[in-house]
Structure formats: structure tokens, C-alpha cells
């Protein structure tokens, strides 16, 4: 004879377990599913970093190495890209607030960022260096040559360029300009002596402006990698982005884009 009490308890347990399973499935509907349901990959960009991600004011479109990669990432998910403007000063807060799915605009991998956010595996090797007027190139052969009150060093606010200057050049005259993309022209015009930048950016500006030089390009102050920045909380999303980047590295896509935009 069936024990009705045991049967009821068993049914209740089964219902509870099924309910928990449904909650688990709902919880597992993470960033990948959200992006695909939306049909759009939201990409945060400062739009001021040649040759990684910059807003072409003439066309109104974003261009650069990271822009191409972001488009390919979106294609792999079957969605389109929509860019969300951010700044170096607000990048961390905007990422953590979920204003976009990824930030991809020449973002340096750092311990400080990794502690608060997720960063993909690194790609492209670069380092901190300087941009100066070609006429002054022989004046700046080491970090010590920059660390003087007479040297006006210009940086954009809130990013690793400013942090480098504050940590390593305490004696220089530090000038902070809000628009990173405008600094090379200001250097060329004599509004400052040196720009703290990165090898990728310096190489591009020297190529584009004959008034500028990057005398320490082959001997940068640091060695770093870029990474794709995301809010914490979705390991599957981080895994997917890492897998995508590994595949694009393996199939030669990243090398082709490096040849196109950087070398």
C-alpha cells in the first residue's frame, strides 16, 4: 500500500528541485544570451587612441585595430556593434556600471583593473614611451631627461599615461589635457615638450606628422599588453572572449590587422 504522506513529500521535493533547476537555468542566461537577444554588442570606446580605436570626425565612424576586432567578435555572435562613448577618467566606473558589454580601445592590462573588473588574455606587446618635437629628439634619451621642472610633460587624465607620469616623473611640470587625440598637435606646436604615450600610438603619430619624433620607441619604459575590459560576474562571457581572441590569433587575423594598422 502506498504511503500517501511519503508520496506527498516526494512530490514536494521533486517540485522544489525542478524549481531550483529553473532558477539555475535562469541565472545561467548571462551576457552571451543577453547580447544575442539584444542583437547588439555594446562596445565602450574613448575614441581617441590611434591606431587602436578612434572616432573619425570626418566620417563619424570608429576606426582602428580594436574596432576591426570588435566587429569580428560581434559577427561571431551574430549581432552588430554599437559604440558607447566613454573617457579614460570614467572608464572603470562605466565598465562596472554595465554601460557596455566590453571596453575595447587600447586598454592596458593592469593589476588594478583586474582586481575590480575582468580583463581578457593580453594581445599585442607595447610599452610606455614619449612623443616630442623632432628638433628636441636628442634632448630626451632617458627617463632622467624628462624628470626635470623645465620639461613640460602632457598627458590625458585618468589613464595609465597620467599614472606613469605621477609615479615616475615627480619633478617634471605635468600638464593634463582632456583630449588625448589633441596632444600630439600641441606637442608639435610647442605647447608642451613631451607626451607620455605608448609605442603603438607614438609610431602612428610620427608617421603622420613630420614635426614629431619618438626617440625612445625601441627602448620603451615598460612592457605591457592590451586587454578587453568587462565587468566582473560572468565567467562564461570572459571565457568566450578569450576563446575568440585565441582563435583570431591562431588563424592569423590579429597579425594581418597589426600589419594594417600598426607596423
Regions found by a protein language model. Give the residues of each.
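Acidic, polar ligand-binding/catalytic clefts
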Residues: 71, 75, 80-145, 213-214, ...
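Extended ligand-binding regions for polar small-molecule ligands
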Residues: 68-76, 134-136, 144, 150, ...
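Extracytoplasmic small-molecule ligand-binding "clamshell" domains
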Residues: 29-106
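Periplasmic-binding protein-like
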Residues: 125-132, 199, 203-246, 263
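A ligand-binding cleft/hinge motif common to bilobed small-molecule-binding domains
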Residues: 89-90, 107-115, 163-167, 186-222
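Short loop->beta-strand "edge-of-pocket" segments that line small-molecule binding or catalytic clefts
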Residues: 40-45, 63, 143-158, 174
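Short helix-initiation/N-cap motifs at beta->coil->alpha
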Residues: 67, 82-93, 138, 157, ...
Amino acid at each position: 500500500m502506498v504511503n500517501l504522506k511519503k508520496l506527498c513529500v516526494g512530490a514536494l521535493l521533486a517540485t522544489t528541485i525542478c524549481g531550483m533547476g529553473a532558477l539555475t537555468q535562469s541565472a545561467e542566461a548571462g551576457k552571451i544570451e543577453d547580447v544575442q537577444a539584444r542583437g547588439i554588442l555594446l562596445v565602450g570606446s574613448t575614441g581617441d587612441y590611434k591606431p587602436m580605436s578612434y572616432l573619425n570626425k570626418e566620417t563619424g565612424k570608429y576606426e582602428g585595430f580594436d574596432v576591426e576586432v570588435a566587429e569580428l567578435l560581434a559577427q561571431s555572435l551574430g549581432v552588430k556593434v554599437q559604440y558607447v562613448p566613454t573617457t579614460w577618467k570614467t572608464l572603470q566606473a562605466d565598465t562596472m556600471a554595465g554601460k557596455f558589454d566590453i571596453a575595447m580601445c587600447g586598454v592596458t592590462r593592469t593589476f588594478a583593473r583586474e582586481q575590480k573588473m575582468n580583463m581578457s588574455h593580453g594581445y599585442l606587446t607595447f610599452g610606455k614611451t614619449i612623443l616630442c618635437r623632432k628638433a628636441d629628439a636628442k634632448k630626451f634619451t632617458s627617463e632622467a631627461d624628462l624628470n626635470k621642472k623645465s620639461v613640460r610633460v602632457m598627458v590625458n587624465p585618468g589613464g595609465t599615461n597620467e599614472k606613469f607620469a605621477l609615479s615616475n616623473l615627480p619633478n617634471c611640470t605635468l600638464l593634463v589635457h582632456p583630449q588625448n587625440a589633441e596632444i600630439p598637435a600641441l606637442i608639435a606646436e610647442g605647447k608642451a615638450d613631451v607626451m607620455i604615450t605608448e609605442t603603438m600610438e607614438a609610431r602612428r603619430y610620427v608617421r603622420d606628422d613630420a614635426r614629431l619624433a619618438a626617440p625612445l620607441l625601441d627602448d620603451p619604459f615598460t612592457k605591457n599588453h592590451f586587454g578587453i575590459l568587462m565587468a566582473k560576474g560572468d565567467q562564461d562571457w570572459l571565457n568566450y572572449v578569450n576563446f575568440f581572441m585565441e582563435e583570431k590569433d591562431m588563424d592569423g587575423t590579429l597579425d594581418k590587422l597589426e600589419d594594417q594598422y600598426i607596423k
